[in-house]
């Protein structure tokens, strides 16, 4: 199965969106903070683009959350796939 279709990837995206919304930031704000475009983040959040671990760490820094906890949650979901 393609990574983008996996439950673990969908959970990752859902968690990232929750973190961004909780921070009160818009896609444009986060992207600008990372030197990226809003469309880059929109593609990630819509599941059209995979995210690598370095990008996850960048997003975690921008949104001020611990990526370790998120990865642990995703790993638990991935074990069930």
Where are the language model's segments positioned?
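Short, charged recognition helix plus adjacent turn
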Residues: 1-2, 61, 69-81
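Recognition helix of helix-turn-helix/homeodomain-like DNA-binding domains
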Residues: 34-51
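Short, solvent-exposed alpha-helical "recognition" segments
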Residues: 50-52, 80-81
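A detector for short, charged/polar N-terminal pre-domain segments
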Residues: 1-11
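Short basic helix-loop element that most often maps to the first helix and adjoining turn
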Residues: 14-33, 58
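Hydrophobic packing within well-folded, soluble alpha/beta domains
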Residues: 20, 30, 41-44, 59-60, ...
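DNA major-groove recognition helix of helix-turn-helix/homeodomain DNA-binding modules
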Residues: 35, 54-70
